[in-house]
Protein backbone atom coordinates (compact mmCIF):
# COMPACT_ATOMS: atom_id res chain seq x y z
CA UNK A 1 0.00 0.00 0.00
CA UNK A 2 1.17 3.50 -0.85
CA UNK A 3 -0.04 5.29 2.31
CA UNK A 4 1.11 8.88 2.44
CA UNK A 5 0.71 12.23 4.18
CA UNK A 6 0.27 15.21 1.82
CA UNK A 7 0.53 18.84 2.98
CA UNK A 8 -0.13 21.52 0.35
CA UNK A 9 0.31 25.29 0.64
CA UNK A 10 -0.87 27.77 -2.00
CA UNK A 11 -0.18 31.49 -2.29
CA UNK A 12 -1.64 33.75 -4.98
CA UNK A 13 -0.06 37.09 -5.80
CA UNK A 14 -0.29 39.99 -8.26
CA UNK A 15 2.26 42.39 -9.66
CA UNK A 16 2.48 44.96 -12.45
CA UNK A 17 1.23 43.42 -15.72
CA UNK A 18 0.82 39.98 -14.21
CA UNK A 19 -0.22 37.51 -11.53
CA UNK A 20 0.95 34.17 -10.22
CA UNK A 21 0.44 31.20 -7.95
CA UNK A 22 3.02 29.50 -5.74
CA UNK A 23 2.39 25.95 -4.55
CA UNK A 24 4.52 24.12 -1.99
CA UNK A 25 3.69 20.43 -1.57
CA UNK A 26 5.20 18.08 1.00
CA UNK A 27 4.54 14.35 0.65
CA UNK A 28 5.84 11.57 2.89
CA UNK A 29 5.10 7.86 3.21
CA UNK A 30 3.26 7.11 6.44
CA UNK A 31 2.50 4.28 8.87
CA UNK A 32 1.38 1.11 7.11
CA UNK A 33 2.95 2.02 3.79
CA UNK A 34 4.94 -0.54 1.82
CA UNK A 35 7.24 2.26 0.68
CA UNK A 36 9.75 4.68 2.19
CA UNK A 37 10.11 8.05 0.49
CA UNK A 38 9.41 11.75 0.91
CA UNK A 39 9.52 14.76 -1.38
CA UNK A 40 8.98 18.49 -1.39
CA UNK A 41 7.81 20.25 -4.54
CA UNK A 42 7.76 23.95 -5.46
CA UNK A 43 5.68 25.14 -8.44
CA UNK A 44 5.45 28.81 -9.43
CA UNK A 45 3.10 29.72 -12.28
CA UNK A 46 3.03 33.25 -13.68
CA UNK A 47 0.83 35.00 -16.23
CA UNK A 48 2.14 38.17 -17.86
CA UNK A 49 0.95 40.49 -20.62
CA UNK A 50 3.07 42.36 -23.16
CA UNK A 51 0.60 44.46 -25.13
CA UNK A 52 -1.50 41.87 -27.00
CA UNK A 53 0.81 38.95 -26.23
CA UNK A 54 0.28 36.77 -23.16
CA UNK A 55 3.26 35.02 -21.59
CA UNK A 56 2.86 32.07 -19.22
CA UNK A 57 5.71 30.52 -17.26
CA UNK A 58 5.94 27.57 -14.90
CA UNK A 59 8.95 27.02 -12.66
CA UNK A 60 9.10 23.55 -11.11
CA UNK A 61 11.52 22.17 -8.52
CA UNK A 62 11.36 18.91 -6.57
CA UNK A 63 13.72 17.26 -4.11
CA UNK A 64 13.00 13.69 -3.07
CA UNK A 65 14.69 11.05 -0.95
CA UNK A 66 13.98 7.56 0.29
CA UNK A 67 15.02 3.91 0.19
CA UNK A 68 11.94 2.48 -1.55
CA UNK A 69 9.87 4.56 -3.95
CA UNK A 70 6.40 3.79 -5.26
CA UNK A 71 6.86 3.76 -9.03
CA UNK A 72 3.57 5.55 -9.64
CA UNK A 73 4.64 8.42 -7.36
CA UNK A 74 7.96 9.20 -9.02
CA UNK A 75 8.59 12.43 -10.88
CA UNK A 76 7.99 12.15 -14.62
CA UNK A 77 10.22 13.84 -17.20
CA UNK A 78 7.58 14.46 -19.87
CA UNK A 79 4.29 14.82 -18.00
CA UNK A 80 2.00 13.29 -15.40
CA UNK A 81 3.06 10.22 -13.43
CA UNK A 82 0.78 7.20 -13.02
CA UNK A 83 -0.67 8.58 -9.80
CA UNK A 84 -1.69 11.84 -11.47
CA UNK A 85 -3.14 9.95 -14.42
CA UNK A 86 -5.33 7.93 -12.07
CA UNK A 87 -6.74 11.21 -10.75
CA UNK A 88 -7.88 12.24 -14.23
CA UNK A 89 -11.17 10.96 -15.65
CA UNK A 90 -9.60 10.98 -19.11
CA UNK A 91 -6.61 8.74 -18.35
CA UNK A 92 -7.56 6.50 -15.41
CA UNK A 93 -8.96 3.83 -17.76
CA UNK A 94 -9.19 2.96 -21.45
CA UNK A 95 -11.74 5.14 -23.18
CA UNK A 96 -11.09 8.50 -24.79
CA UNK A 97 -7.36 7.77 -24.47
CA UNK A 98 -6.01 4.25 -25.01
CA UNK A 99 -3.54 3.00 -22.38
CA UNK A 100 -1.10 2.07 -25.16
CA UNK A 101 -0.33 5.79 -25.34
CA UNK A 102 1.17 5.62 -21.83
CA UNK A 103 3.90 3.10 -22.73
CA UNK A 104 7.59 4.08 -22.87
CA UNK A 105 9.97 3.21 -25.70
CA UNK A 106 13.15 4.34 -27.43
CA UNK A 107 11.15 6.91 -29.38
CA UNK A 108 8.51 9.50 -28.50
CA UNK A 109 4.76 8.99 -28.81
CA UNK A 110 1.80 11.23 -29.66
CA UNK A 111 -0.02 11.78 -26.36
CA UNK A 112 0.84 14.18 -23.54
CA UNK A 113 -0.71 14.27 -20.08
CA UNK A 114 0.39 17.46 -18.26
CA UNK A 115 2.38 17.22 -15.03
CA UNK A 116 5.85 16.53 -13.67
CA UNK A 117 8.66 18.37 -15.41
CA UNK A 118 6.29 18.78 -18.37
CA UNK A 119 8.87 18.36 -21.15
CA UNK A 120 6.09 17.54 -23.59
CA UNK A 121 8.36 16.83 -26.56
CA UNK A 122 9.74 13.75 -24.77
CA UNK A 123 6.36 12.08 -24.15
CA UNK A 124 6.70 8.29 -24.14
CA UNK A 125 10.50 8.40 -24.44
CA UNK A 126 12.68 6.30 -22.12
CA UNK A 127 15.30 9.08 -22.17
CA UNK A 128 18.42 6.93 -21.75
CA UNK A 129 21.61 8.36 -20.28
CA UNK A 130 24.82 6.85 -21.66
CA UNK A 131 28.24 6.03 -20.25
CA UNK A 132 31.36 7.16 -22.11
CA UNK A 133 31.65 3.72 -23.74
CA UNK A 134 28.14 4.00 -25.18
CA UNK A 135 26.39 1.62 -22.78
CA UNK A 136 23.17 2.73 -21.11
CA UNK A 137 23.71 4.16 -17.63
CA UNK A 138 20.07 4.86 -16.74
CA UNK A 139 16.62 5.58 -18.12
CA UNK A 140 15.57 9.07 -17.09
CA UNK A 141 11.91 9.07 -18.10
CA UNK A 142 11.24 9.38 -14.38
CA UNK A 143 13.16 10.09 -11.20
CA UNK A 144 12.94 11.43 -7.66
CA UNK A 145 14.31 14.97 -7.98
CA UNK A 146 14.30 17.48 -10.79
CA UNK A 147 13.79 21.02 -12.02
CA UNK A 148 12.15 22.53 -15.09
CA UNK A 149 11.10 25.78 -16.74
CA UNK A 150 8.08 25.78 -19.05
CA UNK A 151 7.10 28.79 -21.16
CA UNK A 152 4.19 29.56 -23.49
CA UNK A 153 3.81 32.76 -25.54
CA UNK A 154 0.19 33.18 -26.61
CA UNK A 155 -0.24 35.08 -29.89
CA UNK A 156 -3.93 34.29 -30.42
CA UNK A 157 -4.73 38.00 -30.88
CA UNK A 158 -2.89 37.97 -34.21
CA UNK A 159 -4.81 35.00 -35.62
CA UNK A 160 -7.59 35.61 -38.18
CA UNK A 161 -10.86 36.54 -36.49
CA UNK A 162 -12.62 33.43 -37.81
CA UNK A 163 -10.21 31.25 -35.78
CA UNK A 164 -10.33 33.34 -32.62
CA UNK A 165 -14.12 33.42 -32.79
CA UNK A 166 -14.19 29.60 -32.85
CA UNK A 167 -12.31 29.27 -29.54
CA UNK A 168 -8.97 28.37 -31.11
CA UNK A 169 -5.85 29.67 -29.39
CA UNK A 170 -2.23 29.46 -30.47
CA UNK A 171 1.12 29.77 -28.75
CA UNK A 172 4.83 29.16 -29.00
CA UNK A 173 6.25 26.92 -26.28
CA UNK A 174 9.58 25.87 -24.84
CA UNK A 175 10.38 23.43 -22.02
CA UNK A 176 13.70 22.59 -20.38
CA UNK A 177 14.62 20.45 -17.39
CA UNK A 178 16.90 18.07 -15.53
CA UNK A 179 16.11 14.95 -13.50
CA UNK A 180 17.76 12.30 -11.32
CA UNK A 181 16.93 9.17 -9.33
CA UNK A 182 19.77 9.70 -6.86
CA UNK A 183 19.36 10.96 -3.31
CA UNK A 184 20.73 14.51 -3.37
CA UNK A 185 23.57 15.34 -0.96
CA UNK A 186 25.97 18.23 -0.51
CA UNK A 187 28.69 16.10 -2.07
CA UNK A 188 26.87 14.97 -5.23
CA UNK A 189 24.34 17.67 -6.13
CA UNK A 190 26.52 19.17 -8.89
CA UNK A 191 26.86 15.86 -10.74
CA UNK A 192 23.72 13.98 -9.72
CA UNK A 193 21.39 15.29 -12.41
CA UNK A 194 21.01 14.27 -16.03
CA UNK A 195 22.15 16.53 -18.84
CA UNK A 196 19.66 19.24 -19.77
CA UNK A 197 16.82 18.23 -22.07
CA UNK A 198 14.76 20.82 -23.92
CA UNK A 199 12.02 21.09 -26.51
CA UNK A 200 10.33 23.91 -28.42
CA UNK A 201 7.56 24.32 -30.94
CA UNK A 202 4.10 25.69 -31.65
CA UNK A 203 0.74 24.62 -30.24
CA UNK A 204 -3.00 25.13 -30.61
CA UNK A 205 -5.95 24.57 -28.29
CA UNK A 206 -9.67 24.23 -28.90
CA UNK A 207 -12.15 24.63 -26.05
CA UNK A 208 -15.23 22.41 -25.93
CA UNK A 209 -17.93 24.03 -23.80
CA UNK A 210 -21.23 23.50 -25.61
CA UNK A 211 -22.72 20.15 -24.63
CA UNK A 212 -26.37 20.98 -25.22
CA UNK A 213 -28.57 19.25 -22.62
CA UNK A 214 -25.47 18.10 -20.70
CA UNK A 215 -24.87 21.58 -19.34
CA UNK A 216 -23.30 20.39 -16.10
CA UNK A 217 -20.22 19.05 -17.92
CA UNK A 218 -17.25 21.33 -17.37
CA UNK A 219 -15.55 22.75 -20.47
CA UNK A 220 -12.35 20.99 -21.46
CA UNK A 221 -9.52 21.75 -23.84
CA UNK A 222 -8.14 19.67 -26.70
CA UNK A 223 -4.50 20.51 -27.29
CA UNK A 224 -2.37 19.95 -30.40
CA UNK A 225 1.36 20.58 -29.90
CA UNK A 226 4.15 20.33 -32.45
CA UNK A 227 7.53 20.08 -30.67
CA UNK A 228 9.68 20.64 -33.75
CA UNK A 229 12.90 20.91 -31.73
CA UNK A 230 14.44 18.43 -29.27
CA UNK A 231 17.98 19.12 -28.12
CA UNK A 232 18.51 15.41 -27.31
CA UNK A 233 16.39 13.66 -29.90
CA UNK A 234 15.91 9.86 -29.90
CA UNK A 235 18.21 7.87 -32.18
CA UNK A 236 15.12 6.93 -34.20
CA UNK A 237 14.62 10.58 -35.23
CA UNK A 238 16.28 11.93 -38.34
CA UNK A 239 17.33 15.23 -36.79
CA UNK A 240 17.01 17.52 -33.80
CA UNK A 241 14.66 19.69 -35.86
CA UNK A 242 11.83 17.83 -37.59
CA UNK A 243 8.06 17.42 -37.73
CA UNK A 244 6.63 15.99 -34.51
CA UNK A 245 3.14 16.18 -33.05
CA UNK A 246 1.14 15.18 -30.01
CA UNK A 247 -2.37 15.44 -28.64
CA UNK A 248 -3.26 16.44 -25.08
CA UNK A 249 -6.39 16.98 -23.02
CA UNK A 250 -6.43 20.26 -21.07
CA UNK A 251 -3.71 22.90 -21.10
CA UNK A 252 -0.10 21.96 -20.44
CA UNK A 253 -0.08 24.21 -17.34
List the predicted regions and their residue ranges:
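Outer-membrane beta-barrel "beta-signal"
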Residues: 201-202, 241-253
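C-terminal outer-membrane beta-barrel translocator/porin domains of Gram-negative envelope proteins
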Residues: 2-163, 180-182, 248-252
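Short, contiguous acidic/charged loop-to-helix segments that flank catalytic cores in large enzymes
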Residues: 135-143, 184-196, 236
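Outer-membrane beta-barrel transmembrane domain signature
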Residues: 68, 177-199, 206-209
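Membrane-embedded beta-strand positions of outer-membrane beta-barrel proteins
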Residues: 20-24, 57-59, 151, 170-174, ...
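Short proline/glycine-enriched turn/loop segments at secondary-structure junctions
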Residues: 190-192, 211-216, 234-239
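Secondary-structure transition/capping motifs at alpha-helix termini
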Residues: 49-53, 209-216
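Extended hydrophobic-aromatic, low-complexity segments
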Residues: 159-169, 180-184, 212-217
Amino acid sequence: MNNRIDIDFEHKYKYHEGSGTLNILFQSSSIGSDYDYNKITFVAKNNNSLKKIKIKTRLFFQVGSGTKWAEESKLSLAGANKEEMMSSKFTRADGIVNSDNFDYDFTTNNFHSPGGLNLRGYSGYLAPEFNEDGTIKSFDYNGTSGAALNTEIDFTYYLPYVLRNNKIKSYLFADAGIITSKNITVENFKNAFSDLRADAGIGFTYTLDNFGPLETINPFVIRFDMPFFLNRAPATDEDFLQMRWLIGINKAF
